[in-house]
Amino acid sequence: MNRQGSARSHLTLALCTILHGFTHAYGSMLVPLYFRIADDLKLSGVGAATLIVTLYGAVYNLASYAAGLAADRFSRKTLLAIGLLGNAAAILAIGLSRQYSHILMLGVAAGLFGTIFHPSANALASSHYPKAPGMAIGILGIGSGLGFFFGPQIAGWRAATASWQLWNVAQWQKPCVEMALAGLVVGIIFLFLGTDASGAPTRRRGAKIDPALNRRVMRMASVLMFRDFAGVAGLSLAAIYVRNVFNLHVSQAGLFVGIMMLPSVIFNPLAVYLTPKRRRLPGLTMILIIGGLLAGTAPLWPLAGALIILCAFQTMQLASYAVSDAATLERISPEFRGRVVGLFLEIAGTFGALGPWVMGAWADHLHNSHTRFNYFGPFALISACMILAAASPPLIARLGPVLSAIKPMEEISPETMGVVP
């Protein structure tokens, strides 16, 4: 194994993980700020504030197949850098705009750049580690936990404590400005230090994908979309729930939402490692069912108990992404991975993106939004969606056999983590 190539691959995977963190931080940072956004912009309710995140997520996923086509043809490293730089620029503009309509349009722009990440990053990470694509995806998944943790936490903290003044920037906008500037710096660093897999051309004609494979991916996505809805909806519902029921301050709500996501930093790669080969799909079924059962009990608990339950739910929820992504990409030839990820997200992710708006509108129409037992309905919906998604493993299996079998205790050994020669 070429040591220089190995170092480049390790660095690229580490940087992709950081980019993953920024991508999800930008997508979740407004969640604890819903009430401040609604008050500052004089909106009709929290549902109008959630529409910003809903539009971001909808565009992020609707354009995923086009992003997948690009990932299978052009330099994935360059695409990832462009994606983060554009996403950060749009978030910066959100932090400077005072018009709700402009902010909605900027949410769309941020989603268009954000959509580049998953098709390109999943394909790039797995192509750097062809002997252990599952573990590469598991490590990449650490970034989602970091982003979902730091995004809401930093947003809530800085919205409460930032003291700098610039034009008419509101308190809730200050974390947007700060995190956008950080993303611009990281995007430039990645552009110069990230690498495509050795020997991969920077521009290539995409191999023609089998229409039957597309149909199998669409069937899989039509079931896993309920998992995606549960995760995105659960994040927004948690922020609304703790603000209304437990009267948490914006910084406390941000910390609550962030802590919910933190264990996935460890559990995502661990879940992939503990479910190799034939364990992968049964493990996914178990993760989805446990997560669904946990979510339905959230309104039964006081604040501390709700934190534990929702933390466990989101750990299962995010782990299901790492495991299902690994199970899928292990069955897909490298030249098709960008398009497969893009097609999946276009269906499952777009449906999931409706979650924030559905939860915000539901909360606005509750008879008494400050009583925790009135939230049984929304949490039951999330629970049911997770359990429905547990029907997905047989559909993943129909994608085909695992292309490169890795023994359980070898998946993260130096030999199997070898890079493309």
Task: List the predicted regions and their residue ranges.
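Cytoplasmic helix-loop-helix junction between adjacent transmembrane helices
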Residues: L106-S144
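Helix-loop-helix hairpin linking two adjacent transmembrane segments in secondary transporters
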Residues: I139-T195
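Extracytoplasmic gate region of multi-pass secondary transporters
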Residues: L30-V31, R216-V265
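Conserved MFS/SLC helix-loop-helix module at the cytosolic interface between two early adjacent transmembrane helices
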Residues: L62-R98
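C-terminal transmembrane helical hairpin of 12-TM major facilitator-type secondary transporters
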Residues: L281-S324
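Cytoplasmic membrane-interface "Motif A"-like loop-to-helix N-cap segments
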Residues: R73-L84, P276-L288
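Helix-to-loop junctions at the C-terminal end of transmembrane segments
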Residues: A63-S75, F267-R279, A363-D364
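Residue-level signature of mid-helix packing/kink "hotspots" within the transmembrane helices
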Residues: S28, G57-Y65, F148-F149, M261-P269, ...
